[in-house]
Amino acid sequence: MKMTGWKKKLCRGHHLWALGCYMLLAVVALRLSLRLKCDVDSLDLESRDFQSQRCRDVLYKNLKLPAKRSINCSGITRGDQEAVVQALLDNLEVKKKRLPFTDTYYLNITRDCEQFKAQRKFIQFPLSKEELDFPIAYSMVVHEKIENFERLLRAVYAPQNIYCVHVDVKSPETFKEAVKAIISCFPNVFMASKLVPVVYASWSRVQADLNCMEDLLQSSVPWKYLLNTCGTDFPIKTNAEMVLALKMLNGKNSMESEIPSEYKKNRWKYRYEVTDRLYLTSKMKDPPPDNLPMFTGNAYFVASRAFVQHVLENPKSQRLIEWVKDTYSPDEHLWATLQRAPWMPGSVPYHPKYHISDMTAIARLVKWQGHEGDVSMGAPYAPCSGIHQRAICIYGAGDLHWILQNHHLLANKFDPRVDDNVLQCLEEYLRHKAIYGTEL
């Protein structure tokens, strides 16, 4: 097996990491030699020679994530209305709905990590040198629905990347144990060293990401960009596509950052206090520090390593962080404001020409109920084919064609209890594209 070059690069760092890494690679090498009978170096997605094609065929056979037979995912991803209607009708038949995997299921299957990774079809080696040379970091904040977490991890997983998982302190103990069991099977996935109770719309959501930022910067993995996720996210690009998109940013960040409406300005006009939920007080806040104009966006970011370092280390950034702690939903204006701060690496100027909407940024694709409508009449997107939660679309199969036409790296929201067909088709699409480099 000719894995020497990328093996050395992947396994450098702390000796315990290296030991575990080499053991993992040894298992991969053995499996490839015995089962696939082809060399990792031949898995070049740009090569058209027979050997590479044969390897991809065998690899796909072993790692394919097919949707159930009654669903035509190829048609759904192309927007074929007959295929979409069939999937939506199928989703309405309660008797066909599979119950999600439980905490106990994962606690049992992860007793044998190799069996778990093989049965759940995780990709356990880099698919290209370009991906190997451009590791990505993830901050994954979760609190419930263990299967959602495991499927998200599987979809974004690559052995050269690094993943920090923050679990809400308030989550049930069995959920926490199941998360620990899953991540214990991977040397590059770890639990955040500091866990906090996450309260909706409060500072704690930001603190969870900050805790992961600190841990990720201490990792020996030389990651280039950080992406943050929640339990209802799912990627709509392969790891290779993400690497290409991040390289094109050329050190810039990508996140929503716009002028706030008068309604949103109220989020930082008065102080909020937190108990089991957020409470508005009558105490007015001082203006933002350093005469910094405030901008608004969302909780999601695509941030360069240098940006993350300045979030944690720059005194001006720290002053803004302290100031937003008692505001409403600070994650929706902290990152957006730092993205316009002149001292932040990869930021953009205050000027209105640099305003960035959620549709322009690549961080997250979201359908807001208030913006849905007739595209021919100027609406940004068609109505949701799933259901709405807090005015956000939980996607259905009818949304997938539109989703895949966009440039974003991830989309929100998905919930297999609402529509598992759209997730199954997205999984099948991404796995096929990751291995073959082409669509279904």
From Swiss-Prot:
ATP-binding listed as a keyword: no
Q: What is its main location?
A: Golgi
Parts of the chain on the Lumenal side: 31-440
**Annotated InterPro entries:** Glyco_trans_14
Q: Which residues lie on this side of the membrane: Cytoplasmic?
A: 1-12
Record's keyword terms, sorted: Disulfide bond, Glycoprotein, Glycosyltransferase, Golgi apparatus, Membrane, Signal-anchor, Transferase, Transmembrane, Transmembrane helix
What's the catalysed reaction? Answer: a 3-O-[beta-D-galactosyl-(1->3)-N-acetyl-alpha-D-galactosaminyl]-L-seryl-[protein] + UDP-N-acetyl-alpha-D-glucosamine = 3-O-{beta-D-galactosyl-(1->3)-[N-acetyl-beta-D-glucosaminyl-(1->6)]-N-acetyl-alpha-D-galactosaminyl}-L-seryl-[protein] + UDP + H(+); a 3-O-[beta-D-galactosyl-(1->3)-N-acetyl-alpha-D-galactosaminyl]-L-threonyl-[protein] + UDP-N-acetyl-alpha-D-glucosamine = a 3-O-{beta-D-galactosyl-(1->3)-[N-acetyl-beta-D-glucosaminyl-(1->6)]-N-acetyl-alpha-D-galactosaminyl}-L-threonyl-[protein] + UDP + H(+); a beta-D-Gal-(1->4)-beta-D-GlcNAc-(1->3)-beta-D-Gal-(1->4)-beta-D-GlcNAc derivative + UDP-N-acetyl-alpha-D-glucosamine = a beta-D-Gal-(1->4)-beta-D-GlcNAc-(1->3)-[beta-D-GlcNAc-(1->6)]-beta-D-Gal-(1->4)-N-acetyl-beta-D-glucosaminyl derivative + UDP + H(+); 3-O-[N-acetyl-beta-D-glucosaminyl-(1->3)-N-acetyl-alpha-D-galactosaminyl]-L-seryl-[protein] + UDP-N-acetyl-alpha-D-glucosamine = 3-O-[N-acetyl-beta-D-glucosaminyl-(1->3)-[N-acetyl-beta-D-glucosaminyl-(1->6)]-N-acetyl-alpha-D-galactosaminyl]-L-seryl-[protein] + UDP + H(+)
Q: Which GO terms describe its cellular component?
A: Golgi membrane
Family that this chain belongs to: Belongs to the glycosyltransferase 14 family.
* Name this polypeptide is given: Beta-1,3-galactosyl-O-glycosyl-glycoprotein beta-1,6-N-acetylglucosaminyltransferase 3
Give the organism the record lists: Bos taurus
Name of the coding gene: GCNT3
